[in-house]
Amino acid sequence: MERPIDGFIWLDWVVEKLIEKHGVDPEEAEEAFFNKPYKVRKASSGKYLLYGRSSDGRYLFVVFVWEGRRVKVLSAREMEPDERRYYGQK
């Protein structure tokens, strides 16, 4: 990531949603920010979309916002097929 990350902010309800609804562990979502290659796109309302992989090789789609130099994860799930195609493009 071009911007240095000084940590992550996790809200309890987000962690619950990731685990219960999407089956994604917060540590997996964090790994996607450091495992190359990854892609980041700016979305609306100051949100960013990260397309990356966990250390176990899961293809993850992560929605986040910057809070200073920390990342606040809003959602994370496995990529859909069209997102995997986008991620695979150079």
PLM region spans:
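Ribonuclease/tRNase effector modules and their secretory precursors
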Residues: M1-K90
